[in-house]
């Protein structure tokens, strides 16, 4: 189930995005990006609709994923 990011308290949304970014592991790109930059990127993706917050009833967890990968 998609959770509208606009309905999440700002502090909670920030923590969800940070947890997601930290779970993603090491960035092997040419230039290392800070946590703040990565969080800002994910926030922009949520705002643009490119990414969505998803609640898994099976696992009772929240995840962030590309909208194109969501199979609701």
From Swiss-Prot:
InterPro entries hit by this protein: UPF0270, YehU-like_sf
Coiled coil region boundaries: none
Pfam families with a match to the protein in the record: UPF0270
Source superkingdom: Bacteria
Protein name (Swiss-Prot/TrEMBL): UPF0270 protein ESA_04379
Family to which this protein belongs: Belongs to the UPF0270 family.
Organism name: Cronobacter sakazakii (strain ATCC BAA-894) (Enterobacter sakazakii)
């Amino acid at each position: 189930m998609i959770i509208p990011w606009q309905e999440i308290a700002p502090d909670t949304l920030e923590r969800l995005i940070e947890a997601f970014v930290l779970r993603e592991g090491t960035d092997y790109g040419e230039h290392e990006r800070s946590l703040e930059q990565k969080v800002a990127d994910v926030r922009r993706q949520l705002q643009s609709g490119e990414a969505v917050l998803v609640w898994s009833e099976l696992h009772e967890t929240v995840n962030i994923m590309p909208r194109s990968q969501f199979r609701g």
